[in-house]
Amino acid sequence: MSNLKLMKVLGIETSCDETGVAIYDAVTRDIISEQLYSQASKHAEYGGVVPEIASRDHLKKLIPLIRLTVKEAGLNLRDIEGIAYTSGPGLRGPLLIGASTAKAIAMSLNKPSVGIHHMEAHLLINLLEDPAPSFPFLTLLISGGHCLLINAKSLGNYEIVGQTLDDAVGEAFDKVAKILDLGYPGGPKIEALAKNGDPNAFNLPRPMTTKKNHDFSFSGLKTAVFYEFKKINKINDVIKADLAASFQAAVADTLLMKVSSAMEKTGLNELVIGGGVASNKYIREKLVIGLEGRSIFFPPIHRCTDNGAMIAYAGSFYLKDVKQDMTLNIKPRWPLSDLNDG
């Protein structure tokens, strides 16, 4: 962990379709200012994120959000002592916008900057909560692009215990939402609709839960929803709600079984959960009930989706002894296990 004192870290998140900016005070251990802008409405008509649109919107919003974040913290930009930015994984264009902006600010202020692994930031933000987990712990990262089970042994030392072999959890939610004609983004829409449905109405598979490994597969579950949908002659809101609820229950059951098995295998009793899908209240409750007796840590709902706070906080660990470097070293594809190699 960083030994830097009196450090205020500016965090910049632009890996996909959220522009997030925050300032973390390492002395008070507080996020003292934070702004988040979502582009979801701009991508809704396309049914998913359009990289070019995302890049242009980040370019338009990032600098004003940085100014607002600094102002609301009661600071001057010169008071910032380090800059952290998402360097991967993510969309190349959006990553470049964030990285180049961070590097420009760092150079103008003669301050250090550091690139942060997006998924590690999702993992670490839980350490800011009270109570907080202690290394080592098991981590479940569930988002639009990832589904990972990780043995977090120490800072920067992560063993992949299980991962998706096809669709990520959030991706499956988006695709099922498209089948049900709910629109984008699918996660919140399915969760809302499922509240009115019967989770036992459709007998959907719990993929790979009979396998001895801890990997995931959600493509077949998505296909099962598609075939159930096609078999119905007259689709109405009740049937859609039942399908949404049944799908959501299948996902939650699958996650619970895989996590439970992984905790038994690793001997870890603390579970950290992060990523956008971790904001799903049904999944949260299912895991809490199913893992009774274990210690489970969730970030606040607003910190589950991509945000600048997690980047600023992660940056506080890595800014020690960082030298000025203007290289735009982004990594659109960046396995979390690569951090183990330094």
Regions from the PLM with identified roles:
Residues 4-7, 115-138, 314:
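Conserved phosphate-binding catalytic cores of ATP/NTP-utilizing and phosphoryl-transfer enzymes
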Residues 6-89, 118, 122:
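N-terminal beta-alpha supersecondary unit
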Residues 19-25, 139-141, 147-151:
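Short beta-strand scaffold segments in enzyme catalytic cores
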Residues 76, 192-271, 280-289, 294, ...:
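A contiguous, well-structured pocket-lining segment that forms one wall/lid of small-molecule binding clefts
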Residues 85-88, 105, 143, 272-280:
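Glycine-rich beta-strand-to-loop/alpha-helix junction loops that act as flexible
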Residues 115-116, 271, 288-311:
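Conserved phosphate-binding/catalytic loops in two-lobed NTP-binding clefts
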Residues 123-124, 299-340:
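Glycine-rich phosphate-binding/hydrolytic loop that grips phosphoryl groups
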Residues 131, 154-196, 222-223, 227-232:
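Glycine-rich phosphate-binding loop plus the immediately following alpha-helix
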